Amino acid sequence: MSDKQERKVVIRFDHVTKEYKLYKNDKARFKAIFSKRVKYKLKRAVNDLSFEVRKGEGIALIGKNGAGKSTILKMITGVSYPTSGEIYVDGKISALLELSSGFDLESSGIENARFKCSLMGMTNEEIEEVLPDIIEFADLGEYLEQPLRAYSSGMKARLGFAISVNSKPDILIVDEALSVGDKEFRKKCVKKVREIMADKDVTLLFVTHALSTAKEFCQRGIVLEKGTKLYEGDIDDAIEFYDAM
């Protein structure tokens, strides 16, 4: 039995479809809460999608804007739910998506770090253990004691990245987050992801337009177009398929 076969499945999509109702305007959307007669159009963001990710794998979701990549990530993280089909996820997820979202602007950087770690299910003891790593990685100095309303958008993103990569995830989801901050900080981010992926028990789901980066971190790729899977296989073959589209 191969190593891949022995490792357990940590993410499974089983014939998953996701549709959104598009209304003419906000007024129509509000009326739809009280009446089923309001007209709308259905937009299918993900179409009958099936795939599995095993523990320790690195998988790249490849596709142009509108391919359904962000919708897939939202369903994995529980932000959104499928219209039909089943999704199975096993493990603590750290998602490098909207890095500066979910912060309390009136609380300090340190307070926000503790709060976001607690939302990830970490105990107080675990939080205090990783807090020095978050502080060192964010490299925000005295600003960590200041309320986030004093932060620039880049500083918030740095803090968000520092929290996510130091929270000891089972599953790491990266969506263009490696473009955070200046050149030196971006190099620091890439190095940190390399360190995380050196742990064969961490699973990576990677969404990027930088295919060379995907090639470095991932073994397999899934090519998507308008919510439909066109190809799944070895990362080199997936990139070649995408380039030929």
Question: Regions from the language model: what does each represent?
Answer:
Residues 62-64:
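The feature captures the beta-strand-to-loop junction immediately N-terminal to the Walker
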Residues 77:
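Helix-to-loop junction immediately C-terminal to a conserved catalytic motif
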Residues 208-209:
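H-loop/switch region of ABC-family ATPase nucleotide-binding domains
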Residues 217-234, 242:
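H-loop (His-switch) and adjacent beta-strand-loop-beta switch element
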